[in-house]
Amino acid sequence: MSLPSRQTAIIVNPPPPEYINTKKNGRLTNQLQYLQKVVLKDLWKHSFSWPFQRPVDAVKLQLPDYYTIIKNPMDLNTIKKRLENKYYAKASECIEDFNTMFSNCYLYNKPGDDIVLMAQALEKLFMQKLSQMPQEEQVVGVKERIKKGTQQNIAVSSAKEKSSPSATEKVFKQQEIPSVFPKTSISPLNVVQGASVNSSSQTAAQVTKGVKRKADTTTPATSAVKASSEFSPTFTEKSVALPPIKENMPKNVLPDSQQQYNVVKTVKVTEQLRHCSEILKEMLAKKHFSYAWPFYNPVDVNALGLHNYYDVVKNPMDLGTIKEKMDNQEYKDAYKFAADVRLMFMNCYKYNPPDHEVVTMARMLQDVFETHFSKIPIEPVESMPLCYIKTDITETTGRENTNEASSEGNSSDDSEDERVKRLAKLQEQLKAVHQQLQVLSQVPFRKLNKKKEKSKKEKKKEKVNNSNENPRKMCEQMRLKEKSKRNQPKKRKQQFIGLKSEDEDNAKPMNYDEKRQLSLNINKLPGDKLGRVVHIIQSREPSLSNSNPDEIEIDFETLKASTLRELEKYVSACLRKRPLKPPAKKIMMSKEELHSQKKQELEKRLLDVNNQLNSRKRQTKSDKTQPSKAVENVSRLSESSSSSSSSSESESSSSDLSSSDSSDSESEMFPKFTEVKPNDSPSKENVKKMKNECIPPEGRTGVTQIGYCVQDTTSANTTLVHQTTPSHVMPPNHHQLAFNYQELEHLQTVKNISPLQILPPSGDSEQLSNGITVMHPSGDSDTTMLESECQAPVQKDIKIKNADSWKSLGKPVKPSGVMKSSDELFNQFRKAAIEKEVKARTQELIRKHLEQNTKELKASQENQRDLGNGLTVESFSNKIQNKCSGEEQKEHQQSSEAQDKSKLWLLKDRDLARQKEQERRRREAMVGTIDMTLQSDIMTMFENNFD
């Protein structure tokens, strides 16, 4: 065809490929039907398919060398006609035509051309549709007879073809038939002999011209020759042996092997065989074409001149035959498939010398096969489905009956029947075993479901009961449950693992503060309780179940929410047990009994305190060391009142305090406080409180200063504003009112009175600078002068009786403040603040007047007194002030140091928590990453050691 066109310099298109099967062995299978209706239809509709919809027009496109390079042209229109006329006997032939079309495009054109990109897009769509094709190829219908009209048309057309001048066709056929010889002579198989010299020289020249043209434009010559050798029409036509059409043949005529083939065809394809088909597709892929092409088709002995091939190789094998057997499902398992592939390679190694090029190709392809075959999963026998066994049993028993009827006298048929019977028995046994396994596997699931339902019902009942019980009883139940859980055997614990998953789903996740508090609480636990903590974590966290309980690292971020909640319950229960430590008898007591016992204890303590106070009152003048013990008793009283946990208990204790001996308690409550001696060095706390509360002006005696202290405290607790009283109006035993301020504050906290109500006024710090004066006999004139000045603002209804004054002091200690609401407390606090401001103003006025008077007194006294009369009031007050300020500074330093230490501990805890969080995040980030530098270092070390 192309030789005369080159000689005359005229480009002539060859006739299109044939689409009518002259051998009449075409079939219509489900896979071919899918290729026609789905694959071809979608490819035809694609926007890039227009260059492939008809044969290449070399005349129109001015491609004189196209048909010299492309020996087997193909297009979508030819494939469509072949599918319509049932040209193909199986789907693999049609798929081969599609691949030929794409390969022709890649072979002739450059890699970056537009037509190549269009072909790649079409091929991608083709492979996607091909993956959805049915796995098993089955004949759809019986072969239809060709109508007479069509036969006549075919005969007329064939007659026309014969009568027409067919010079070009003859030349094309002559070139087509011997084209195998030069191709194989150029290929690595240098074993061709006995070919005709003329035809080989002509075709060799033709191929070399095409190769030169191809080398100038697209790719090297070797790839062109190899690709053209694959798709030569004579090579494929001679090598492909179509399977016989078994539909038209009766079953009784077929031999035993073909009957066996029919039995296997109905069996489902296993997972291993699917992997084998994928391996076969991989070996036939284009990326392995350079070393796999000699094994695509059977060895053509006549074309290659290998007359002794079948003498050496007894069982020839190739990839085309293996693919055909795989399509026909002749392989029962993956090992038979592997045996055929290895047989193909062994034949190559056996016939060719070791240094031959084909042997190296075979080794490369075998490496590909072995690597993929080693990755096939191993299928257990029990994994076969029941439907597979049932179909096999029915088919084999049916064939057994037919075989018995058809082969009564033949010994070969008898052996076949025995084999089928054994197979049926084995499959029945396998079915029975499989059913037993299913029954056994379903039994524990039912038991677990029943246990789950029972446990759910029990949980609901427990919740209803627990809602009505006391919290102490709930704690007892928790303890009993924990003991029972410890005593349970391991098997019982394993059964409850399924129930924990429900708790895990319902558990509320913890925030950062809760986790931090939980870690602090765990650190507070004693050593004997930590074992239970480790047990809870290991039982609920499978990742930590195998860890060493003696040395375990716990990251709260990795623990489940249910585990954290369980730990929180256990730790809180343990911490509740530790401070209480109640005896066994008191556990079962009710609230009323507990309240009654506490009341009795408080009453006893109050009686003891009252008795001691009475004794202290008698002995105050004689013995001055006793009041310190009374202070201790008062502190015991305050501790007993503050130890009551609930509000009802505090009410009962306060009511007892107020109700017992109204006259005695009011008259004896405050005489119990100690007398302040001028020469005694006050303690740090007393100095601090007196600094904040006692506000004496200059020149006043110790008696008036004590009156200031008492009136400040009473005005802070009550709504009445009491001004300072003169010294001659004070009761005779009011010098005992210089009490310990700390104990008063403690009593007020016991009575739940807000601590803001007992704060000193704002002007106290300024008034402290005046100091505390000491009583001396020369101060009579001072007191008389102060009386006249202080009487004007103090003219209010103040009774002088002792009982009334003590009642006014005892009022703020009453428990009425406990029952007040928050609004009343706020109003009371506001009133107290207003009264403090008014009082501060009045005191400021009094202080100014006193300062003026003291200045005048100092001026007169300096003139009258001598320099050696001793220390003045001012110098003594300055000394006391210096002492107080020094002690206050020490206290301030100690408190600041304690605060700094607590802040440092908090900062350390925060830093530790922050570092742990950063470390955890870093570990999480490093889990999914690969350290390439580390990998490279390992590789270099390995190479150095290897060398």
From Swiss-Prot:
The NET domain covers: 500-582
Q: Which PROSITE patterns match?
A: BROMODOMAIN_1, BROMODOMAIN_2, NET
User: Compositional bias (Low complexity) spans?
Assistant: 637-662
Q: Just give the chief location class.
A: nucleus
The keyword Repeat appears for this protein: yes
Tissue-specific expression: Testis-specific. A 3-fold higher expression is seen in adult testis than in embryo testis. Expression seems to be correlated with histone H4 hyperacetylation during the haploid phase of spermatogenesis (spermiogenesis). No expression, or very low expression is seen in patients' testes with abnormal spermatogenesis. Expressed in cancers such as non-small cell lung cancer and squamous cell carcinomas of the head and neck as well as of esophagus, but not in melanoma or in cancers of the colon, breast, kidney and bladder.
Q: Does the keyword Nucleus apply?
A: yes
CDD domains, per database record: Bromo_Brdt_I_like, Bromo_Brdt_II_like
Composition bias (Basic and acidic residues) maps to: 470-481, 674-692, 885-924
Q: Where is this site: Histone H4K5ac binding?
A: 109, 114
Ranges where the record places region Disordered = 202-228, 395-420, 444-511, 610-698, 882-924
Q: How does it assemble?
A: Interacts with mRNA splicing machinery proteins SRSF2, DDX5, HNRNPK and TARDBP. Interacts with the acetylated N-terminus of histone H1, H2, H3 and H4. Interacts with P-TEFb components CDK9 and CCNT1/cyclin-T1. Interacts with SMARCE1. Interacts with the acetylated N-terminus of histone H1.4, H2A, H2B, H3 and H4.
Note on domains (UniProt): Bromo domains mediate interaction with histones that have acetylated lysine residues at specific positions. Bromo domain 1 mediates binding with histone H4 acetylated at 'Lys-5' and 'Lys-8' (H4K5ac and H4K8ac, respectively). The bromo domains also recognize and bind a subset of butyrylated histones: able to bind histone H4 butyrylated at 'Lys-8' (H4K8ac), while it is not able to bind H4 butyrylated at 'Lys-5' (H4K5ac).
**Anything else of interest in the record?**
BRDT is a promising target for male contraception. Inhibition by thienodiazepine inhibitor (+)-JQ1 that binds Asn-109, prevents recognition of acetylated histone H4, causing a complete and reversible contraceptive effect in male mice.
**What is known about what this protein does?**
Testis-specific chromatin protein that specifically binds histone H4 acetylated at 'Lys-5' and 'Lys-8' (H4K5ac and H4K8ac, respectively) and plays a key role in spermatogenesis. Required in late pachytene spermatocytes: plays a role in meiotic and post-meiotic cells by binding to acetylated histones at the promoter of specific meiotic and post-meiotic genes, facilitating their activation at the appropriate time. In the post-meiotic phase of spermatogenesis, binds to hyperacetylated histones and participates in their general removal from DNA.
Q: What is this protein called?
A: Bromodomain testis-specific protein
